[in-house]
Swiss-Prot record:
One of its GO terms (biological process) is lipid A biosynthetic process. PANTHER family: 4-AMINO-4-DEOXY-L-ARABINOSE-PHOSPHOUNDECAPRENOL FLIPPASE SUBUNIT ARNE-RELATED (PTHR30561:SF23), SMR FAMILY PROTON-DEPENDENT DRUG EFFLUX TRANSPORTER SUGE (PTHR30561). Heterodimer of ArnE and ArnF. Belongs to the ArnE family. Coiled coil: none annotated. Pathway: Bacterial outer membrane biogenesis; lipopolysaccharide biosynthesis. This is Probable 4-amino-4-deoxy-L-arabinose-phosphoundecaprenol flippase subunit ArnE. It comes from the Bacteria.
């Protein structure tokens, strides 16, 4: 169960980051203030929920085990930026993502 909470905390944190990115996207028509408030509001909600879940994780797992798992955030953000905004991700970056996933598997199996 704590693993699910950890993944959810990570996804909510990433969601907050992605909402912040979306808030900075240019608009072709009016409504900039509304756009900004919507996405920043969603970012605050996601980040706040992630923090609450993170505190639950820290009550159960040692920080030395839990914290490295947040490296998943780099993986989620890379995938989302590539898929949502069609950002270019060079092969070297994909290799780094693979290394992060490998490290998480190694650390997770030690827990």
């Amino acid at each position: 169960m704590i693993g699910v909470i950890l993944v959810l905390a990570s996804l909510l944190s990433v969601g907050g980051q992605l909402c912040q990115k979306q808030a900075t996207r240019p608009l072709t028509v009016g409504g900039r203030r509304r756009h900004l408030m919507l996405w920043l509001g969603l970012a605050l909600i996601c980040m706040g929920a992630a923090m609450v879940l993170w505190l639950l994780v820290l009550q159960t797992l040692p920080v030395g085990i839990a914290y490295p798992m947040l490296s998943l955030n780099f993986v989620w953000v890379t995938l989302a930026a590539w898929k949502i905004w069609h950002e270019q991700v060079p092969p070297r970056h994909w290799f780094g993502v693979a290394l992060i996933i490998s490290g998480i598997i190694i650390l997770g199996s030690a827990a």
